From Swiss-Prot:
Pfam families: Pkinase (PF00069). It comes from Arabidopsis thaliana (Mouse-ear cress). Residues 102-386 form the Protein kinase domain. This is Shaggy-related protein kinase beta. It comes from the Eukaryota. PROSITE patterns: PROTEIN_KINASE_ATP (PS00107), PROTEIN_KINASE_DOM (PS50011), PROTEIN_KINASE_ST (PS00108).
Amino acid sequence: MNVVRRLTSIASGRNFVSSDNVGETETPRSKPNQNREETESTETTSYEKDSVSSSENSDHLPKEIREDMDCGIIKGNGTESGRIITTKKKGLNDQKDKTISYRAEHVIGTGSFGVVFQAKCLETEEKVAIKKVLQDKRYKNRELQIMRMLDHPNVVELKHSFFSTTEKDELYLNLVLEYVPETIYRASRSYTKMNQHMPLIYIQLYTYQICRAMNYLHQVVGVCHRDIKPQNLLVNNVTHEVKICDFGSAKMLIPGEPNISYICSRYYRAPELIFGATEYTSAIDMWSVGCVMAELFLGHPLFPGETSVDQLVEIIKILGTPAREEIKNMNPRYNDFKFPQIKAQPWHKIFRRQVSPEAMDLASRLLQYSPNLRCTALEACAHPFFDDLRDPRASLPNGRALPPLFDFTAQELAGASVELRHRLIPEHARK
């Protein structure tokens, strides 16, 4: 196995370049509604119009798909600048259906999953993001099913959904989402380009909100995101409110049921996934959160592996060789596998800058080999690293107030001990 040769060379002080150059994208290649970072060309024309057709053309589709429809299917599938998309939204409580029109403005993201474009609702002047994904006509779309369940300040809001077709009779699902202008990825890179570090208050603020969103997904909804990375973390650059997006890989994990291990973008992929585990838990998301937090301090990925083998090597170079029990906890099938002994590096040498003991402690609690030893999302929110946010005098660098951080619902705190609740909600925020 190449990982053993790589680690043996590291242990002996030699450099070894792996010949394992198997092409591996940053995200898995398994189904149409999973996000993948590849390019797709688009055209630009102006002021063409797509309009909703009658529901008759949906009659040939399976019942599962028809149940997902708010209206009929739109004929045409344009995302070109200026194109008008007119659809309908079902009225609530016996109210009439609403006609809604969107004007496509420009593409803001592309990939094998489809395309995301910015648009404006003509009735309200509100900016939205529309994610268009190819829909398998045989199945319900898992991303749509999950997004309809979500309602949290740190999760991007699904406003509307509709289906559209092409001349080739391809069916596309269009998810109309709230528009958030920035990503944590771009925010982090902007500091790196200026040879600056992201201010600590932003690292604390962003990581805290990610953890709060993870607690909501894991404990309230029962969903594992499975692709947490800076590109999937939206941030409002005025309020600095963070929202998780892209649920194309998300899934409700059922104990005892197998799942694919080739999931999650490589740099943020938990080691049990690299070991091929199929009965993993939402702890894979918490590993990803630890990777994101470290990246905000470093300005670059903590574990930048070029292949799955290289990824494991990068992890072991920092965390050291996993103990036999840790390997068993990640995947029992690898219980007897022997790795060369590599010592773990202390965190202060990893960060190479003045980082608080609290920050290093949280990173170490998130980046544990054993999934069951990683702290939960709610435990992470209560960590002393975030105590600055709980200070009643805390504010953004420009003096503006922090976004709401402590307005937990009863569902979010369900099962939390009195002590944990006390640590989570500062006295000034208690009702």
